[in-house]
From Swiss-Prot:
One of its GO terms (molecular function) is osmosensor activity. Residues 47-176, 261-311, 961-984, 1067-1165, 1534-1559 are annotated as: Disordered. Residues 88-107, 145-172, 261-302, 1136-1165 have a biased composition (Low complexity). The gene is HKR1. Induction: Expression is highly increased during spheroplast regeneration. This is Signaling mucin HKR1. GO terms for biological process: (1->3)-beta-D-glucan biosynthetic process; cellular bud site selection; fungal-type cell wall organization; hyperosmotic response; osmosensory signaling pathway via Sho1 osmosensor; signal transduction involved in filamentous growth. It comes from Saccharomyces cerevisiae (strain ATCC 204508 / S288c). Residues 1-21 form the signal peptide. InterPro entries: MSB2. It comes from the Eukaryota.
Length: 1802
């Protein structure tokens, strides 16, 4: 338990440190009208509705049973019992579980819907009542009490008021609608900041309610085979007319909890609930109640669904004529986990008096199909918008229909099928509305929509027909025999539009006349006209006129005449000077026989015009090499025209370079004519001036037999638009390959139009790339008119066109196309082949006299953001309000997203779906246009989304049940800013959604965004999905009701109040993390209209255990009586929260019981939200908003991104270090590894030593070891660039220096790559640290002097630079240390050393996270100035330098009071060398001790060896024995075990002379007789023994004196035999134990010294000599266990003995298999009786079985041979009793002989 608590405390400290880290790094500010963020990671909501009619009805439901312990499981069951089939019940359960790791977040939604047939009609008379509710709430925090226990919150509610109170001392009253809020907080030890604010606004309106509802039949059916299911539901028809008296209130609460953990759950009057987990952030809640006016509500719904391979979606349409509702919930917080987010509610208005009927059907087949049919009434027009948006495309379409027109659209998807059919729409004739909206989305966080003020009008018309020419104004006509007339107009100038007109006429047999006019000057239009006439048999006449000067137009005319047989005469006139025109005339004459080589140089002066005339003549047999250089004056434009004519047999290579003056535009025209047999390769580069636009026109004419390859690059000026027109004409037999690149200026839009005309027999391959400017839109417009035969290309050609568009970060590209239809039907087919095929077909069938203009806008982004991406965008806008629009997007991942949206006023919704492999990403964005409100609301949202995987049910269910499951959706944090301005005009809400992307998988990064869900407006709205039991897919269907309140006339009173309080305190209290909350709420509401009654009872219990922290908030249900005569509701909710540090367990059980009578109906909703937050996950958000409340932090750091100059743009600012998972690069100390590494890492540019600088050394920890730096150049580059900034920061004494330092870094980037060898330091990867702290060495812990009291020296830090990085091998470290050599100011080295050794110095508190992270990686054990002290002159290093060599800095301070060091931190290191003598003394002592210890061990081993050897010699000898073989050989001594506790057990065996199979007898059974309790007598030794608890025999006394008398008087008694055989006079005193009063005196002879006399010989007839042993001798003998004998095989109890040598137990087993010991009462007659004869005792057989022979089979046999009396005996017991044992062995044989002799006599 102690270790478990320690783990919990460490986990809590880690979490609080992570909170501190982000609190110190970022300032978050917001106000009550700012955005919403709420992320409970687990939420459960249940909605149940029950109605009955006139009969008893019992319902038992167990809506949810959830168990969560590491994984998630859910089960639900419902039991319905109806006595009559007149009741209906439906239940909706939604459970959302969200789990977030460092990078991913998954979400699962499930819902279950069970329906039974029922029908009831409930008319209710007019009701009138008034209700007012107030709430009083206290919300504060006491830092001292938080650590001891959490705030206990209790609430009570009645019909008049709701009171919420806490145990805190401060309170803020409020007056709002009923809201129940529960907060629990956990505080850290540092302190708490509490802040509370409230604003109350109240509006009261009287209300009247009248409602008539009819619930139709609901049926559900499903088949068990899994291939088909059918569900038909006819929902309710509801008509409501009512007036409400509703309070409209706004309340905001804000609580700033510094270093605290807060969990709150709130239920609002509108039925919504939120749950927040906050940390170091303000919590703001803002809500408003809804208002209703007199209206009529009619709702009809019909649902039909048939599914084969995938489930079907049921859609519902509800129309409400007049209804309004407004509810806003705001919560701003900083969360440690992700979860649910508030919903966005739409406000829609439109004129009333309309009825809608719609029928929708869906069928799933092998191919997905969707069909929508709209029928419009006679005088109505339709206006609607459907916007389907993804990361790249936004489309908006507008359709105008006429009376009795219909629109039919079909979408065909190759991989899935889905068809939707919607019925006609009927509308009143007086309804009309029109609106158009445009949305642009860019895949960048900082993107925004920018509409340029410069008009760009581009119009093109194409007409193609192979056999007939079509004369159309503004059209192209191309045929083999008819020329083509083309006219185009471009407008591009910001201040003066430019009119450009071009006409091209092409024919094989007719000359081509081209006329162009360009106008480009900002202040004076320029008229430029060019005419080109080309013919194979006629000369070409070209005339050009250019006007380009800003103040004086220039007239330039050129004429070229070319002929194969005649020379070319060229006359040119140029006017270029601003004040004086310059006339330049040039004539070129070519002769077939004389080559001309001409080189000319032109120089124009600013003040004098130059007239230059040149003549070139080339011959057909020699090439002409022409080199020209033109230099224009700075103040005058230059107009240059050149013409090159080559001979028929020699190609001409021409290279030209033009340089324009900075202040004047340049007009350049070039014409190239090549020979029929040689191709011409032309390369041109044009550079325009920065201040004037450039108009450039080029024409290329190719010969019939050779292709022309042209490559052009255009660069426009930054301040003026460019109008560029190009025309390409290819020969009939050769293809033309054209590649163009356009770059637009950053401040002006560019209008680009391209026309390609292909010959009938050759294909055209065109590739174009467009790059837009960052701040302007590029509008591309194309218009096509088709012939009645619908032929676009000629029959024998194909066109392969590939286009890629790359938008700027802040602008989108809008392409608009407009089509006008002929009287016939037109079919447009769009086919795209990618990872999947999608075909969209539109069919328009208007009346013969109707025009159907359609406008579509497509916004494309770069294909780099869409890998394997395909999406469709459909958007239409009409002039009446449609009823329903369905959009279906199907993908290969078996995911069907079906969205149904009812648009009564002007509402657009953007839906997009993209897929990669099996990942689904879908997004949705909303915008609202409200024309009838009283104020102007502007809303902007920032949405970030994370993709969630799809779960599909795969198990079959019952046939009678209908299960529906919601597909997973993405959760989005919102940041909303609202600005309300009261006005008398219209109200417009514009929502711009800017998307940021999040990757679901590392390999497939996509971006998408979608709100959590669409807010349901009225009670008839549902959010559901249908899943067939055997299906493998899931479908989501959403239905919306949009209502109108334009006819509502309400008057309201307004009042507001604001109260705020701030309390700041700081305490140091140990952190606690235990929460126990019990909330009890009893709600009663009684309204009596009739004598009927209804009761409802529900109870819920929640218990949760979490690894880090668990919070449960349970809110009572909010009940509303609609049609009830009498109602009594009682509900009690108790909440208990527990915590388990090892597991996470969640158990939720809900039980509801309800009984009702008479006609009644009720509707209840209950919400339970449970938040479980991870302990170590932190997300950093940097934002800056103009807000009212600013959250203070303990340490304030800049939060604005820093500019990124070009010098560091390529270098990531996230510090790259080696991941801790991979471990150090070198596992152990291996100095030889440096042989394969470079000697140093140097920068690209060598660093020279500045003046007054010293070369110091900075070492780094293992995260930046040398091997890692060699393998990761970016990491070493960060040291070269960022380490000087780290060292400069403590010496920056002015704000400008700090700002300059800050400006040198780019924006900090959060990045983390798990599992890789390289990671980046970011708040995510170091979330367990409050700030990036260093690993402190022992030296830093002992530091006594802080650098806070010191003042940094005033030095110039601009020259600090890193010279190189070198390796250093340290035997105490398992890696190669990286040491950076830095040039540092000499006078500041001492102060820098103090900063490094002080853990609280400013060096480690850099406000920039990258620099602070790098400072935390500095190893303070590496000295600054001593690594090169004992090395070579070039900076060699001490090879075994360790951090321990650097002594305590306090010692250095005591020795150097003035604060100066000679060698910096190496002073103590140098001093350690001077103390080497004292250190050597200790080493000598240790060596001497080791030598003495070794010698002692060797001596001990030597003595033990000789003792063991002596023992083995004694064992080899055979001991003498007095025991002889029996004369009759009847019994042989098999074994005798003598046990002595001091030396272990020894077993001796004497083998009989017979074979081993013969029967043997144990001497133990023959010679031991039980004489009493725990006593035994030995008949051989004639000794009396006592048996102890271990089974050992202790010597007791000898045989009684009268024992020999029973054997006769011949003097041959046993005592005399024992005395004569066993003892002699020289024997030492025998130790024995005599506990009997009867001593056998006279048997043993004891001398005056107490010694026993033993005699060597005896006589059979000699009388026994009595002798006596002293008691102390015998007692001492027994104490030493020198006479213990253990008997085996006696008794019936289990007896075991431990073998001290082997550690095993030796068990004496007998043949019967049982274990026996000596019994306590085996014999009743004691041995002391005189009636027992010796021979009788000897031959008395024991009743116990003989020992098993196998017991001794594994024991070592010891042969006892006959020995004489004079032989020596070697005893195996090397003890002090050797003499006694020897005598016993000598006398044993004599005893046996005497015994046998007595037996023979008898």
């Amino acid at each position: 338990m102690v270790s478990l608590k320690i783990k919990k405390i460490l986990l809590l400290v880690s979490l609080l440190n992570a909170i501190e880290a982000y609190s110190n790094d970022t300032i978050y500010s917001t106000s009550y009208n700012n955005g919403i963020e709420s992320t409970p990671s687990y939420s459960t909501s249940a909605i149940s509705s029950t109605g009955s009619s006139n009969k008893e009805n019992a319902i038992t439901s167990s809506s949810e049973t959830t168990t969560m312990a590491g994984q998630y499981g859910e089960s639900g069951s419902t039991t319905i019992m109806d006595e009559q089939e007149t009741g209906t019940s439906s239940q909706y359960i939604s459970v959302t579980t969200t789990t977030q790791t460092s990078d991913t977040m998954s979400s699962v939604k499930k819902s279950t819907e069970i329906a039974t047939p029922s029908s009831s009609i409930v008319p209710t008379p007019l009701q009138s009542y008034s209700d007012e509710s107030q709430i009083s709430q206290t919300l504060s925090h006491n830092p001292k009490s938080v650590a001891e226990s959490d705030s206990d919150t209790t609430s009570s509610e009645s019909s008049s008021s709701v009171i919420i109170s806490t145990s805190d001392s401060s309170a803020v009253p409020r007056e709002i609608s009923p809201i129940i809020t529960t907060d629990s907080q956990i505080s850290k030890e540092e302190g708490t900041l509490a802040q509370t604010s409230s604003i109350s606004e109240t509006t009261r309106i009287a209300q009247m309610v009248t409602r008539v509802s009819q619930i139709s039949s609901i049926t559900a059916a499903s088949t068990i085979d899994g291939f088909s299911s059918e569900s038909t539901q006819t929902d309710f028809s509801n008509t409501v007319s009512f007036e409400n008296s509703v309070e409209e209130e706004y309340a905001m609460s804000k609580s700033q909890l510094s270093e605290s953990y807060s969990s709150s759950s709130t239920v609002y009057s509108g039925g919504e609930s939120t749950a927040d987990k906050t940390s170091s952030s303000p919590i703001t809640s803002f809500s408003s109640s809804y208002s209703q006016t007199t209206s009529t509500e009619t709702s009809e719904s019909s649902r039909v669904a048939v599914g084969v391979s995938r489930p079907s979606s049921i859609t519902q349409t509800t129309s409400i004529d007049s209804f309004s509702m407004s509810e806003v919930e705001l919560s701003t917080y900083y969360d440690l986990s992700a979860g649910n987010y508030p919903d966005q509610e739409l406000i829609v208005d439109r004129p009333a008096t309309s009825s809608t009927a719609e029928t929708s059907s869906e069928a799933s087949q092998g191919v997905s199909r969707e069909s929508n049919t709209f029928a419009v009434s006679s005088i109505s027009t339709t206006n609607f918008i459907v916007s389907s948006a993804s990361d790249t495309v936004v489309s908006t379409s507008s359709t105008n229909t006429v009376p009795y027109s219909s629109v039919h659209s079909t979408f065909v998807h190759a991989t899935s099928s889905s068809t939707y059919i919607s019925s006609s729409l009927y509308s009143s004739p007086s309804l009309s509305a029109s609106v158009s909206s445009h949305f642009g989305v860019a895949p960048f966080p900082s993107a925004y929509i920018s509409f340029s003020s410069v008009p760009v009008a581009v119009s093109s018309t194409y007409t193609s027909s192979p056999s007939a020419s079509v004369v159309v104004p503004s059209a192209y006509a191309s045929s083999p025999s008819v020329p083509v007339a083309v006219s185009s107009t471009y407008t591009s100038s910001p201040s003066a539009p430019a009119a450009i007109s071009s006409t091209y006429t092409s024919s094989p047999s007719a000359p081509v006349a081209v006329s162009s006019t360009y106008t480009s000057s900002p202040s004076a239009p320029a008229a430029i006209s060019s005419t080109y006439t080309s013919s194979p048999s006629a000369p070409v006449a070209v005339s050009s006129t250019y006007t380009s000067s800003p103040s004086a137009p220039a007239a330039i005319s050129s004429t070229y005449t070319s002929s194969p047989s005649a020379p070319v005469a060229v006359s040119s006139t140029y006017t270029s000077s601003p004040s004086a025109p310059v006339a330049i005339s040039s004539t070129y004459t070519s002769s077939p026989s004389v080559p001309v080589a001409v080189s000319s140089t032109y120089t124009s002066s600013p003040s004098a015009p130059a007239a230059i005339s040149s003549t070139y003549t080339s011959s057909p047999s020699a090439p002409v090499a022409v080199s020209s250089t033109y230099t224009s004056s700075p103040s005058a434009p230059a107009a240059i025209s050149s013409t090159y004519t080559s001979s028929p047999s020699v190609p001409v290579a021409v290279s030209s370079t033009y340089t324009s003056s900075p202040s004047a535009p340049a007009a350049i025209s070039s014409t190239y004519t090549s020979s029929p047999s040689v191709p011409v390769a032309v390369s041109s580069t044009y550079t325009s001036s920065p201040s004037a636009p450039a108009a450039i026109s080029s024409t290329y004419t190719s010969s019939p037999s050779a292709p022309v390859a042209v490559s052009s690059t255009y660069t426009s000026s930054p301040s003026a638009p460019a109008a560029i027109s190009s025309t390409y004409t290819s020969s009939p037999s050769a293809p033309v390959a054209v590649s163009s690149t356009y770059t637009s200026s950053p401040s002006a839009p560019a209008a680009i139009s391209s026309t390609y005309t292909s010959s009938p027999s050759a294909p055209v391959a065109v590739s174009s790339t467009y790059t837009s400017s960052p701040s302007a839109l590029v509008v591309l417009s194309s218009t096509s008119t088709s012939s009645p035969y619908d032929i676009v290309y000629s029959p024998s050609t194909f066109a392969a066109i590939s286009s890629g568009y790359t938008p700027s970060p802040s602008a989108s590209v809008a392409m608009s196309s407009t089509s006008s239809s002929s009287p016939y039907d037109i079919v447009y087919s769009l086919s795209s082949s990618a990872s999947r095929s999608s075909i969209a077909t539109y069919e328009f069938s208007p009346s013969p006299s109707t025009s159907l203009p359609t406008s579509s806008t497509y916004t494309y982004f770069s294909s780099a953001y869409a890998f394997e991406f395909s999406s469709e965008r459909y958007s239409t806008t009409s002039t009446i309000a449609p009823t329903q629009i369905h959009s279906t997007l199907s993908r290969i991942t078996d995911f069907l997203l079906q969205t149904s949206m009812a648009i009564q006023s002007i509402v657009s919704q953007q839906i997009s779906t993209s897929s990669t492999l099996n990942d689904e990403i879908h997004s949705s964005a909303l915008s609202v246009f409200n024309p009838s409100a009283s104020n102007l609301v502007e809303t902007s949202l920032i949405i970030s989304s994370t993709q969630a995987s799809i779960t599909s049910p795969k198990n079959s269910a019952k046939i009678s049940s209908l299960q529906s499951q919601l597909s997973s959706s993405t959760k989005n944090p919102y940041d909303t800013a609202n600005k309300n301005t009261e006005t008398s005009g219209r109200s417009t809400v514009v929502s711009n959604f800017l998307y940021t992307s999040s990757a679901a998988k590392p390999d497939n990064e996509k971006f998408s965004a979608t709100p959590t869900e669409i807010t349901t407006i009225s009670s008839s709205s549902h959010a559901y999905s249908l899943s067939i039991p055997s299906s493998h897919n899931s479908v989501t269907g959403l239905s919306h009701n949009f209502v109108d309140s334009s006819k509502s006339a309400t008057s309201f009173g307004y009042s507001s109040s604001s109260i705020s309080s701030i309390k700041l305190s700081k305490e140091t209290i140990p952190a606690s993390k235990s929460v126990s909350n019990t909330q009890e709420r009893i709600t009663s509401f009684t309204s009596t209209l009739r004598a009927n009654s209804q009761s409802e009872k529900s109870e819920g219990r929640n218990s949760v255990g979490s690894l880090q922290s668990s919070h449960i908030s349970s809110n009572p249900s909010l009940s509303t009586n609609t049609k009830v005569d009498s109602k009594s509701l009682s509900r009690k909710v108790s909440k208990t929260m527990g915590e388990n540090g090892e597991e996470t367990g969640l158990t939720t059980t809900k039980t509801q019981y309800k009984s009702s009578s008479e006609t009644s109906g009720s509707y209840s909703r209950s919400f339970t939200k449970i938040s479980i937050g991870p302990a170590t996950t932190a997300v950093q958000t940097q934002a800056s908003t103009n807000s009212v409340f600013t959250a203070p932090a303990l340490s304030t750091y800049p939060t604005t991104p820093y500019p990124s100059p070009n010098s560091y743009a390529w270098l990531p600012t996230a510090i790259i270090v080696e991941s801790s998972e991979t471990g150090p690069t070198t596992a152990s100390f291996n100095p030889s590894i440096t042989g394969s590494l470079p000697n140093a890492i140097e920068p690209a540019v060598a660093v020279s030593e500045p003046i007054n600088h010293t070369l110091i050394t900075i070492g780094f920890t293992a995260a930046l070891n040398y091997v890692f730096l060699v393998q990761n150049p970016l990491s070493s580059a960060q040291i070269f660039n960022f380490l000087p900034l780290v060292l400069k920061y403590p010496f920056s004494n002015t704000s400008s220096e700090l700002d300059n330092s800050i400006g040198e870094l780019s924006t900090f980037i959060l990045s983390y790559r798990s599992g890789s060898s390289t990671t980046t330091l970011s708040p995510k990867s170091i979330s367990s640290l409050s700030v990036v702290k260093k690993k402190k060495n022992q030296q830093k812990k002992n530091a006594t002097k802080s650098t806070e009291d010191l003042h940094p020296p005033q030095v110039d830090t601009s020259s600090i630079a890193v010279k190189k990085i070198v390796p250093m091998v340290d035997s105490s470290k398992a890696y190669i240390v990286s040491v950076a050599e830095v040039y540092f100011p000499t006078e500041a080295v001492t102060y820098l050393q103090q900063l490094i050794l002080d853990e609280n110095s400013t060096l480690y508190s850099n406000p920039q996270t990258p620099l602070r992270s790098l400072a935390g990686l500095i190893d303070s054990g590496i000295p600054l100035g001593g690594l090169t002290l004992y090395g070579s002159g070039d900076g060699g290093y001490v090879p075994s330098l360790t951090s321990s060599s650097v002594l305590d800095s306090s010692k250095g301070n005591s020795q150097n009071i003035d604060g100066t060091y000679k060698y910096g931190a190496l002073d103590d290191f140098i001093n350690s060398f001077t103390d080497s003598a004292s250190a050597g003394k200790y080493a000598v002592k240790i060596i001497i001790f080791l030598i003495v210890l070794t010698i002692g061990v060797l001596l001990w081993l030597f003595v033990a060896f000789f003792a063991f050897r002596h023992r083995n010699i004694l064992l080899k000898r055979h001991p003498r024995n007095c025991i002889g073989k029996s004369l009759n050989n009847e019994r042989e001594l098999e074994s005798t075990e003598l046990s002595r506790s001091s030396s272990g057990n020894q077993v001796y065996n004497e083998k009989p002379p017979e074979s081993e199979n013969e029967s043997v007898y144990s001497a133990v059974d023959d010679h031991y007789i039980v004489t009493g309790e725990n006593t035994v007598y030995n008949t051989i030794h004639r000794l009396h023994y006592t048996i102890n608890d271990d089974g050992d025999l202790l010597y007791r006394d000898a045989i009684p004196l009268d024992f020999d008398q029973t054997n006769g008087d011949d003097g041959s008694g046993i005592d005399s035999i024992v005395r004569d055989c066993v003892y002699d006079k020289n024997q030492d005193a025998t130790e024995a134990f005599l506990n009997d009063e009867e001593s056998i005196s006279g048997i043993l002879d004891v001398d005056e010294n107490g010694d026993i006399r033993l005699y060597d010989s005896y006589s059979d007839n000699e009388e026994s000599n009595s002798f006596h042993l002293p008691d102390e001798v015998i007692e001492n003998y027994n104490k030493n266990h020198l006479c213990e004998t253990k008997l085996h095989g006696l008794g019936t109890e289990s007896c075991t003995t431990d073998d001290p040598d082997t550690g095993n137990q030796i068990t004496n087993e007998f043949s019967t298999g049982s274990q026996t010991c000596l019994p306590s009462t085996a014999y009743t007659t004691p041995l002391h009786t005189n009636s027992i004869k010796l021979h009788t005792l000897r031959y008395t057989e024991s009743s116990l079985p003989k020992p098993n022979q196998t017991l001794f089979s594994n024991l070592e046999d010891l042969e006892i041979e006959d020995i004489d009396d004079n032989g020596s005996v070697s005893d195996v017991h090397i003890e002090e009793l050797d003499a006694l044992d020897e005598e016993l062995y000598k006398r044993m044989s004599k005893v046996i002989k005497q015994q046998n002799h007595q037996t023979t006599k008898i």
